[in-house]
C-alpha cells in the first residue's frame, strides 16, 4: 500500500508508514509467506488515518478608522479575507479568498456599493460617530472600522443698516426717528440656517444741540438760534 514499508528484525517485522498527505484513509497489506515446504501465508491489514485538515482564517480591514468632512462624503476601505489550508498542521497550498459582508451603524452613516461608506452632511454642532462591522462568511472572524465626522461649522453673518442715512431738522427744533435693521443670520457649513435673529444695538448722538431721544432710534434737535449745526448718530 502507498506509504507503507517494512523492515525485518530478529523478532519479526517493523512496519513504517510515511505521513498521509491526503484527506482519505490509506490502507495496505502485510503478507508473510512461509518459506518451508508448508507454503502457508498470512496477511495483516494495515490502515492509516486521513490527514487532519484545518484552516487558519484571516480577516483584516484597512484603515482601522475613517474620518469624514462635516459637509459629507464617501470613503472606501479594503479588506483581506482569506483562509489557509493545513494538513496535519502544515501549510498546504496558497491562501484562498473568503467572502465577507459588512454593516454600518451610526447616525448619518450608510453603506454603499463596494467597500464604501457614505456620510451625509452633519448639520449638528457635535461630532458624529459610527462603526463598520465586517464579518467573514465561513468563520467567526469579525473586524471593525471606527467612523467619525466633524461637527458642523457654525458662523454668523451680522447686518446693521440705518434708513435714512441723514436727517434734517427745522430751526425751531424737533424729534425725528430713523429705521434700524440689526440682525444676525446663522450659517451651518456655509449655508443659511433658519431666519435672521434680531440683535440689540445702542446709539450715541454727538454734536451741539443734538441728543438721543427716548429710544435708540430717535434724535432730538434743540431750537437753533444761530448758524447751521451738524451732528452725528452712531449706531
Q: How would you name each of these model-derived features?
A:
Residues 18-24, 120-126, 222-227:
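Short, surface-exposed loop/turn segments at beta-strand-coil junctions that are enriched for proline
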Residues 19, 34-36, 50, 83, ...:
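Surface-exposed loop/turn motifs at beta-strand-loop junctions within extracellular Ig-like
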Residues 1-16, 83-117, 179-218:
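Surface-exposed binding patches on compact interaction domains or structured appendages
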Residues 54-80, 154-181:
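Beta-sheet-dominated interaction scaffolds and their linkers
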Residues 39-47, 140-146:
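Extracellular and select intracellular beta-sandwich modules with Ser/Thr-enriched
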Residues 24-36, 126-138, 228-235:
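A short beta-strand micro-motif common to beta-rich folds, especially ectodomain repeats
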Residues 46-54, 147-154:
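Interdomain boundary/hinge segments at the C-termini of tandem beta-sandwich modules
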Amino acid at each position: 500500500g502507498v506509504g507503507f514499508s517494512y523492515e525485518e528484525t530478529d523478532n519479526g517485522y517493523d512496519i513504517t508508514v510515511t505521513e498521509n498527505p491526503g484527506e482519505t484513509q490509506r490502507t495496505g497489506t502485510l503478507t508473510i509467506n512461509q518459506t518451508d515446504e508448508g507454503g502457508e501465508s498470512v496477511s495483516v491489514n494495515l490502515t492509516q488515518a486521513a490527514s487532519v485538515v484545518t484552516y487558519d482564517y484571516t480577516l483584516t480591514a484597512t484603515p482601522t478608522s475613517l474620518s469624514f468632512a462635516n459637509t459629507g462624503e464617501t470613503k472606501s476601505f479594503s479588506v483581506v479575507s482569506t483562509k489557509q489550508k493545513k494538513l496535519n498542521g502544515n501549510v498546504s497550498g496558497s491562501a484562498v479568498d473568503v467572502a465577507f459582508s459588512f454593516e454600518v451603524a451610526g447616525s448619518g452613516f450608510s453603506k454603499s456599493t463596494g467597500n464604501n461608506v457614505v456620510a451625509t452632511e452633519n448639520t449638528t454642532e457635535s461630532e458624529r460617530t459610527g462603526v463598520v462591522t465586517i464579518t467573514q462568511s465561513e468563520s467567526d472572524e469579525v473586524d471593525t472600522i471606527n467612523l467619525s465626522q466633524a461637527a458642523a461649522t457654525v458662523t454668523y453673518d451680522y447686518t446693521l443698516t440705518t434708513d435714512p442715512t441723514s436727517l434734517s431738522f427745522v430751526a425751531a427744533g424737533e424729534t425725528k426717528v430713523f429705521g434700524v435693521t440689526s440682525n444676525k443670520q446663522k450659517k451651518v457649513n456655509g449655508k443659511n440656517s433658519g431666519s435672521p435673529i434680531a440683535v440689540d444695538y445702542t446709539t450715541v448722538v454727538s454734536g451741539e444741540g443734538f441728543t438721543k431721544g427716548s429710544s435708540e432710534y430717535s434724535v432730538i434737535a434743540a431750537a437753533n438760534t444761530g448758524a447751521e449745526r451738524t451732528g452725528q448718530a452712531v449706531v
